[in-house]
């Protein structure tokens, strides 16, 4: 595989599949020995997630708010989407799945169903509450009926808004705000990193993001360390 110009991650995944197959074959008596033990496994460099600067995130949110001033349903919806993605660190699929009964505006919290059907309650702040309330009261259409009637985010025809539409809205807002191009998942990364920078502990960030293990959340400490090193090298006279 190494001679076919495949990426390290692809080679690693395929090697893992081969090892898994032969482990099963040996366990069930289909082969006498496991030839995959001789397979090497390349080290895969872990890429750091894309994270907006705090000022960049603020610019993105302010741009979304300013566009929504005209009361356009599309702009109100986009404003609510980016505010919630950044405020809660929700996955785009979790945002799409939100129903009206999952929202508590008074408590400023969302009930989110994450991976493995794990449920969590995530708080959000006043800016996200303002955006969401504006969308629900002034932008969200009232469909005559159908499967999308309880969805928080609806399209013009009353259907549940999809992940692709949310991604397009986020990319559009990033371009208009003249910040780094980001996807919804980058807002999740940004939320986690900014929480840690602000003094939140790893366990809290794990709960907010809905990670099943703390080790998944620890990647954001690497992001913080990388940012720290970058800032140090820029600022210190003897870096």
Regions found by a protein language model. Name each.
Residues 1-239:
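Conserved catalytic core of the tyrosine transesterase superfamily
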